[in-house]
Structures are given as structure tokens and as C-alpha cells.
Amino acid sequence: MANDLNKPDYLFEVSWEVCNKVGGIYTVIATKSLYLKSQLKRHHILIGPDVWMDTDANPDFQEDPQLWQDWKAEAAKSGIRMRIGRWNVPGSPVAILVDFKQFLTDTDRILAKYWEKFGVDSITGNWDYKESVLFGYVAGKVIESYYRFYLTGAEKVVAQFHEWQTGSGILYLKQCGLPVATVFTTHATVVGRCLAGNNLPLYDGMESYDGNEKARQFNVTALHSLESKSAENSDIFTTVSEITARECNHFLPRQVDVVTPNGFENSFTPATEEEYKEKRAAARLKLREVAAAMSGKPVSEDAILVGIGGRYEYRNKGIDVFIDAVNKVRTSDFRGKEIHAFIMIPSGHNGADRDLVAKLEGKGSADYTTQVSHYLMNPEYDRITGRFRELGIANAADSNIKVYFIPSYLNGNDGVFNMKYYDLLIGLDLTLFPSYYEPWGYTPLESLAFRVPTLTTSLAGFGMWVQTHYNKEHPGITVVERNDSNYQDVVEAAANRIREIALVTDEQRQEYMDNAKEVSTIALWENQIQYYQQAYSQAIEKMKAAMDNYSQIAEKPIMKYEKIQVSSPSWKSVMVTRRLPEALQGLEVLSKNLWWCWNESAKALFKSIDPTVWHKSGHNPLVVLDTVSIKRFKELARDAA
């Protein structure tokens, strides 16, 4: 790390995607850990949820029973159950998977404490929300336990928490008063994602939206509240792109401190030219075999293979644009090479299509065809196949352009391809990621790293990064200007990109592929890590400035370890600071009874005390009672009398 920056001696990193692939955050942390290994070694500690504890062995995790076994035994005495080992990614970083289910019976107590202490509004939170709160809470306890067992108070310790799902860990650490510098990184905003996913104009109309009101409208108040309080209470608040920083600055109660763009480690790509050629040939062969089995027609060796991958966010990820663009080429007078388009988007399914598998194994009917490789759980409600029907995309035998939906995670064991996503990606000729909402955009970056030309948009963080950090011609990537009102222009641009790739000469194609790889290097961790270093350094500086608050703990790191009380909430703080007139004592009782949350009359009552304070408090009656002047309460008491 740069000499003029404070370097952490220990870095804890908490995410729902540690050893648990859901989206791009998995790649962020996995690749960054490899880069940081030489600097932090075993002092870079990753914490994730033990979501595989009741199922088969986690393919991403290898437990090491010998690692820190004394501490593990000590932590178990305070109810912390965890598995310690290595993440099965390059570099094999230390990973701790925590079991948060033993705290289920404490859920209400924990939520009440966060409400009283920080104003986190969890009333509307469903089980997924509560599960996330418990995970972050236990992750915070793990960091506290490790600190008290191993550290002296002299070390510089940073804990980075990714996304709102881990934010309760920040609140826990702040509550227990350890000298641990906290960084909160959001890879999107709750409200921004909701607006974009519900076809509302996020970018043109952003300033007109009230984040709290929109959160209530979309029933994500709990998520938004935790996200807001996490940003507010962290030492340093970061996000992954300038476009998402704009969201954060508007919807959350704090400005972003540092923009920390994501990076990539090219160790994930073939190490030699020979390996690259072998992997590309194997991928193309498999893609052509499956396409032939699904369509019922052989696929030519020089066919153009196009793809899109990522989460099933139909509009946000530009899946709608992808389908419409392919259809635009299909219905035009295009007479070039065969084009086979693969939509590799995981969705709910009930396993591989058995007739397709039989056909691939040479046992099934040669006449069987399908557009979907796996049995969809609710095909009648699926938007991708629904759009196929609307546009008449049926992979007709005489059509030179065909489309396939692959709704399974490509983890090497999907039942049809039985190859991992990267091992198939390398065989494509073009990827399209025409996103509407894409805070960063790992998928086009991954595509470039594997030498596959791609398309993204100006609304993707990575697209903006290319525009500002690669100042040469870049035929390997097209960045399409996208806004709230030019959908058809984006479809046309994507269709033109397909035609372009289909018509280039072999020599031009090689130039595109070489440029793709070159562009990807601007986002290597060796170039991007500086922004994370800044965030860690600033967090340490902020923590140092508050060291007086931590002096007692620093001198006696294990003091009070056995005396932490976790069984019951205390209302002492409100009882000793509030002096309500006798006629209004009922407000005290009502504010602590969750009944007010769903009673409109009760809400109106608290609002009437002081509408401005009610709004600024996020509709928190405890804050209202603490904030409003005694003069105002006396006025209300006289009215009540």
C-alpha cells in the first residue's frame, strides 16, 4: 500500500457472498483477496453466512479444524458457532462461516435494541431481512470476539461491510465500543434498485423522489432503514461508481466519502495462449452441441455465438434489450452467418430437461426441440419466454438466428452443459449487457478479460469507467449512451453490434479480441486497489481521532468479556432523559408498544406533536419524545387538560 496511507494490520471483510455466490460481490471479494494476500496474509479475514450447514458440503469452502481452535472454543462459550477454513478461490483466503440461527430466539430483542439505539425501523422486515440482520449481528460478534482474544489495542483494524445485508454488524461494533474502523460499501441502493426495477425513470426524476416515501411505497422500509443507518454510523461510506454515488447522496442520509470501483484479477483467465485456445475450442464445441440438440439442427463451426449472463433482473440488466435486439436482427434482411444467442440467467427451475439430456446422450428422440434447457418452476409467468411468445421467437427450422434460455447456475453441475460460466463465456463471439441499472457491471469486464468483445451502457459503472479511463479506440467494447427515454435507440445499437461482429473478417475479429483483453487491464486490482486503500486509511484516521473513547479497551483488551449482557433490552436511556408532563405519560408507554406502527391514529398523534421532527426522525416516536422541547410538551399538556 502507498507509504503515505495508514495501512490496516487486520482487515475483516463481511459479505453475504463470501463462499456463497449470488452475484458480482462474490467476484469483487474473491479477486481482491488474492491481490491482498501478499500484504495481509492471514490478517485478511473474510466472514460469510454458513448457508450450507444443513445441506451438502459447500463447494466454495474447505474447513480447517486446526485454525484458531483455541479462540473458536472460547467464542463458543458466548454462543458463537462458526466454521473456520479456506475459501476455494485462487489464494485460498481465510474464511469464517457463521451460524446465525442460534440467535433466532433473540431476534425481537436485537431488533428492539437497534430501534432504540439507532432508529432502525424493522417493523416491515420479512424473514429475509431478519436473516440478514442476524448474520450481520453475529459477524460483528465474531470480530469483537477475535479482537478481545488476540489483539492488544495497538493494531490498526478495519472491518469492511458490503451491502445493507451486513450493516447490523457496523451497528454492533459501534455499540460495543471497540477501536475497529468500519467501512460500509454499498453496491447499489435499495430504493434505486426498486425504482429501476419498477419501470420508473430513476435518472431523470431522481431529485423528485423522497427515499423514505418510496421505500414505504415499495414495502422496503426495513431494508432502506438499515442501509441508511449503516451508512450514517460507519466511519467511512463508499460505493462502487460515480453513478451510484449520485443515488447514495440523494437517497441516503450521508454523502459518499470514497468511490471504490471494483477490480479484477486476471489469474481467473487462461495463463497461456495454448490453454486459451484449448478452453475456447472446448467451450464452442459444447455451446454448439447444446444449441444443435435444443434447435434440432446442426450448428456450423463458424456460427456467431452471442450471450448475456447475470441476475434475473429483466429490465435492470437489459435482458429486454437483448431479446429485442436479437429479434430485430432476426426479422431484418440480415443474410450473414448463423447467430445463436444464449440467455444464461439463473431462475427457479426443477432440474435439467430430461428429454434434452437424453438427446445429448444419444438416447432420446432426434425430433425433440426446446428453447429452455431446464424445467421452469412457473413458466406461465416467466418474462423471458413470455417475450419470446410476444415476438414469435420459436427457433423455426428455417431461421438463421436462434435464441436459447439457460435458467440454471452454470457451476459445472447444471445437468446440461456441466461446465462453469467462465468455461463457456470464453467460447462466445460477443456478449451484450445493455443495462439500465448497473452500479458497476462485472459481466462486461469478465467478458473482456476472456477476450470476448462486449457491449455495455453509459448507465453502468464500468461503462463510465471505460469512457473516462481508456482514451483510445476500443473496438473490443461498445458503450451505448442510455437514458430514461431512448430504449429503442439502445435496441438498435445492440442489434448493430451483433451485425458488426457477425460481418467482421477473421483479422478484424482478432483485433477486437486483443483490444478486449487490453481494455480489461484498466480494472485490474493493481490499478483499482488504491481507492480501497484510501477508504481504509481514512477510516483508520477517523478511528484514531476518536481514540479517547477506546483507551480503556485498548489497555485491557479482554476486560468485561464474560460480562456482556445479551438477554434483555433496557429502556434506562429514555427513562432518565425524558420528563413528560403527567398528562402525557401515556405517550411514553405508547412509543414502546409496537402497536403504534400499524395504527394510523397513533402515527397521527406522534406527528401532531411536531410534524417537522416526526419527518426528520424517520417516523420514530422515541426520537420525537427525546427531541421536542419541554415547552411544547407543556403546551400539549394544557390542551389535554
Where are these regions (language model features)?
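Catalytic cores of nucleotide-sugar-dependent glycosyltransferases that transfer UDP/GDP/TDP-activated
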Residues: 1-563, 567-571, 587, 622-623, ...
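A short, well-structured beta->alpha microelement
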Residues: 563, 579-619, 628-632
